[in-house]
Amino acid sequence: MLDPSSSEEESDEIVEEESGKEVLGSAPSGARLSPSRTSEGSAGSAGLGGGGAGAGAGVGAGGGGGSGASSGGGAGGLQPSSRAGGGRPSSPSPSVVSEKEKEELERLQKEEEERKKRLQLYVFVMRCIAYPFNAKQPTDMARRQQKISKQQLQTVKDRFQAFLNGETQIMADEAFMNAVQSYYEVFLKSDRVARMVQSGGCSANDSREVFKKHIEKRVRSLPEIDGLSKETVLSSWMAKFDAIYRGEEDPRKQQARMTASAASELILSKEQLYEMFQNILGIKKFEHQLLYNACQLDNPDEQAAQIRRELDGRLQMADQIARERKFPKFVSKEMENMYIEELKSSVNLLMANLESMPVSKGGEFKLQKLKRSHNASIIDMGEESENQLSKSDVVLSFSLEVVIMEVQGLKSLAPNRIVYCTMEVEGGEKLQTDQAEASKPTWGTQGDFSTTHALPAVKVKLFTESTGVLALEDKELGRVILHPTPNSPKQSEWHKMTVSKNCPDQDLKIKLAVRMDKPQNMKHSGYLWAIGKNVWKRWKKRFFVLVQVSQYTFAMCSYREKKAEPQELLQLDGYTVDYTDPQPGLEGGRAFFNAVKEGDTVIFASDDEQDRILWVQAMYRATGQSHKPVPPTQVQKLNAKGGNVPQLDAPISQFYADRAQKHGMDEFISSNPCNFDHASLFEMVQRLTLDHRLNDSYSCLGWFSPGQVFVLDEYCARNGVRGCHRHLCYLRDLLERAENGAMIDPTLLHYSFAFCASHVHGNRPDGIGTVTVEEKERFEEIKERLRVLLENQITHFRYCFPFGRPEGALKATLSLLERVLMKDIVTPVPQEEVKTVIRKCLEQAALVNYSRLSEYAKIEENQKDAENVGRLITPAKKLEDTIRLAELVIEVLQQNEEHHAEPHVDKGEAFAWWSDLMVEHAETFLSLFAVDMDAALEVQPPDTWDSFPLFQLLNDFLRTDYNLCNGKFHKHLQDLFAPLVVRYVDLMESSIAQSIHRGFERESWEPVKSLTSNLPNVNLPNVNLPKVPNLPVNIPLGIPQMPTFSAPSWMAAIYDADNGSGTSEDLFWKLDALQTFIRDLHWPEEEFGKHLEQRLKLMASDMIESCVKRTRIAFEVKLQKTSRSTDFRVPQSICTMFNVMVDAKAQSTKLCSMEMGQEHQYHSKIDELIEETVKEMITLLVAKFVTILEGVLAKLSRYDEGTLFSSFLSFTVKAASKYVDVPKPGMDVADAYVTFVRHSQDVLRDKVNEEMYIERLFDQWYNSSMNVICTWLTDRMDLQLHIYQLKTLIRMVKKTYRDFRLQGVLDSTLNSKTYETIRNRLTVEEATASVSEGGGLQGISMKDSDEEDEEDD
């Protein structure tokens, strides 16, 4: 079904048709008019200066619908307004309905005008696609990625959510899960990504690259694993990411789809290009087919001829403009003459391009880079003397195929006689068929020949083998001579042969075919009658060939038989061909036509009308004339119902033209391209192409596809669209899209802007030196719009370039802004000026980013507290919100650093200042946050410490940032929290001091290990999340309560290691926790940090000193209260006090030592104190042991000789032993002492945790014991020891020696001189006793003791 707008009735409405043509700007060929508006003409094509009558207003950008034609002035065409007015009678009082009808009519008129404009534009585009001779499809353009739609983004979100919920089969460790969770929350759920998808600038590759960048830092920070490199982990994670992103989709299908899309993004065929621009311009399929056939787009000769006519028209228009002095308005008057030269040189360049095209039949769409010729004879068409052809220039090469089928009429020969044929082309080699019997003379043999003769002679002879013995040659039976032409029939035919004299068969016939191919440079051939003034001076019939020597040179040549060179030739340059009436006086020929040139006319005649039409069409293409000949009998033939088929079918192009005319398309086909304002037409097609491109499936960022670039390039070159106009329109279209939210590549804007800037400032980027006033004004307007856009993009850089995508776009934007700020293209803009502009943008950006962040935080808070709508905003709630806001602030700054702070890295020194400006931006951003932070901190009650996590969060970020560390905000943060830290340390110091005082007052000195079941009764810190340490509950009411704080490992230390007292353990943990907390603050200012450290070390030193002294006092008091007899057992508390010393020494190394050399004094001082105290404690304990030993020896002293007790005891025992068995005297004392020693040794060894202290104690104890015994014996040098004294001492000494040896006391200590003295004395006493006492010592002996020792060894 046809469109109603192209009905047959349209041909009757002449007024409407003419007005439609007027709107499109096509005027009669003889009345080329100047542009109606100089400004519109200036925006026109290079050299065309606008269109014909009405083109400026009707087709130009400023046209006002159909009425624009009236401003064209001049001749031809009716105004559309008159048509509208005459369509229906007007009412004296128009109603609302009539107004609506009028509006509807105007709308329909505008739609019809737009349709016609698009159809005309499509014709021009089709011709560019059909026969390109300037441009090619670029193969070096960056391949564009498929863009993500909103639905695809939601699908990807769902896939990642399913993975995080464990609903997929993809195995992953915790680290990868955390990375995906972070990516999902930060990137996929971001509103900035949704905006990027909406803008058409987000591709799957963007998502992948962001994830890769996101995980690289995470993977680098993972601990090293043997045999597993970080690269392996990275590639494994990316493979898993791809699996999640792809979901259940078959990768093969995805790959196939990607391959197909990649192919469509590369080189397109002609058919694909036609289809693309049908979609772009809204052309229907049947309209395309009508136009395609009528324009003969499949005929390269017709297309080349069309180009030659267009270029000739442009040269004529350039002459007209120069003659009438109707130039566009230039910035300089001197440019007018230059303008004409540019028009002509641009046409000459196109002519050279066309001339360099190979003369061929075409067919295959070749996209090779065209070789540009600079042949002077071709470019300077006016110099005929340089362009004359000689006969030798016209060289034709024909290929012939001769196929011999069979012979008839061989009756006189015997059936078995051998016959064969030969064939030759005059002047060439001779070929022969196979042999055949006379009864069946058939061959089907083909011979191939080549010749330069336009009318070759083909000879075919029939031979039979001679049977005579002396015959030298075979006998010729007959021959036939043919004179084929390229127009001759190609099928086989019967030919009568000329029979030899001696051949009895006179009716010989041969069936053969001669096919003569038409060479590529022969455009037509045939027999014509001709007569001319300079050539072919006699009216006679000749064989003519129309030869194309080059794209611009054609010759009409007449040939004689068997001649390679033409007999005569006529070069067709400057001639015009047309149909004519029969000429009187010329006999021969039926259908006449002529070729006319100033001073010469050549008349031709063919034998039939069909041949004449074909000749005129071929010569019309060759002459390049603007006038198209119309056959005088065309209408009658078309209307004839019973005309012969050959006449109707002959010129098939005429048949298609008639169909196009029937559907109203002829005006678009026959219109002269030179009469159109191609500037506005190109503006329209470029805008529509951009719309089509931005709506396709690629994330193009404004870049055209290779096929689109090719067609637009060809259109501009062929129709003379000025380069500056092209780029200005492109910039304007791109700016409109960018301002409306589309993502446009700044590099693309930069290319077009640089071109326009270079052109406007006279740098001739495309060789055009003329600059119109309109170009300059439009450039300034676009420059200002571009500056505003770029500044806005930099202000909203987080949203215009989310997560640093598109890659390099921010850097390109900065580069372009720097270019836009330049006053000209030579003088670089001062760096300070650029920095000032960008600084202003980034200051505004800080406000924009913080405002949006605050809003986001409020929305998040409202969602979280939806159930507590009426909840009051308490100081704690405000602080909690501030901490959450601080986390978001840090996240923003980290993203800025990661994604937006790289231009100076990639560009070397070009943007070295960008880092500084981003630091300023960050400080401004933080200063806005500081206002809210200060407000939240001001309302906090005094002496509360919940704000410390806020400091730690911010400080941990700031101190690791090279640029922000100790910056303005960081200093403010320190000033805010320094008094708080000092106050906190003061209170903690007071609290710890009081806990020491009160703790030691009520200290039970039980080890903590034995009190674990009673932990609530011990003064230990609360076990909560690590924040800030608690003050103990027993502090005065005047000191505020501390919030919870604990070190992660303190409970483990209490349970597993030391047996110190509750007070000491509490002290050491609090000191450690306080120092850990202050250390974890990582105070950035070195001086204050050292001050804090020094103060805490000094505090620890003082506190530990106090602990040590209090323990020493308690130790002495405890010893004084214990027993002095051998019933004494070392109490647990004594061991605990020793362990306190052990802990104090260990903790002092950590808590009291400073890294700086001179400040080791705290540590060394407390170490000395501990050492001295331990010595004193050992001395006191040893003194206690010595006291007990002295008590034992005092008991033994009662047995001394000469004492009353000794005599009495001796007599009593002797008397009693006669009647009863008296126990061995003294053994109970010895055993009690030995038990005491062993028990004390075991307790000390088991409970005291420092081996060195035990060794020192045992050494001192052993030496002191021996000294006391030695002294006691020395005092009795003159007395003989009582038997009981001797037995007791031997047992005590022997067991003491043995026990201390078992405890690890060295032999050098054990076998001291004192011990030797004691041993010798006791040995002597033993010998004496054994002599005086008949019964001896009852098995107790020093010797026995030695033997026992040896056995022990």
From Swiss-Prot:
Residues 1177-1353 are annotated as: Mediates targeting and association with DCVs. PROSITE patterns: C2, MHD1, PH_DOMAIN. GO terms for biological process: dense core granule exocytosis; exocytosis; positive regulation of exocytosis; protein transport; synaptic vesicle exocytosis. One of its GO terms (cellular component) is presynapse. SMART domains: DUF1041, PH. Residues 1-109, 1329-1353 are annotated as: Disordered. Residues 98-109 have a biased composition (Basic and acidic residues). Residues 380-495 form the C2 domain. Specifically expressed in neural and endocrine secretory tissues. Expressed in brain and pancreas and at low level in heart. Also expressed in fetal heart, cerebellum, cerebral cortex, medulla, occipital pole, frontal and temporal lobes, and putamen, as well as weak expression in spinal cord. Residues 521-624 form the PH domain. Residues 790-1129 are annotated as: Interaction with DRD2. Residues 931-1111 form the MHD1 domain. The keyword Methyltransferase does not apply. The keyword Transport applies. InterPro entries: C2_dom (IPR000008), CAPS (IPR033227), MUN_dom (IPR010439), Munc13_1 (IPR014770), PH-like_dom_sf (IPR011993), PH_domain (IPR001849). It is a peripheral membrane protein. Residues 1-19 have a biased composition (Acidic residues). Keywords: Calcium, Cytoplasmic vesicle, Exocytosis, Lipid-binding, Membrane, Metal-binding, Phosphoprotein, Protein transport, Synapse, Transport. Pfam families: C2_CAPS, MUN, PH. It is found in: Synapse; Cytoplasmic vesicle, Secretory vesicle, Neuronal dense core vesicle membrane. Homodimer. Interacts with RASL10B. Interacts with the dopamine receptor DRD2. The PH domain is essential for regulated exocytosis and binds phospholipids and plasma membrane. It however does not mediate binding to DCVs. This is Calcium-dependent secretion activator 1. It comes from Homo sapiens (Human). The lineage of its organism: Eukaryota, Metazoa, Chordata, Craniata, Vertebrata.
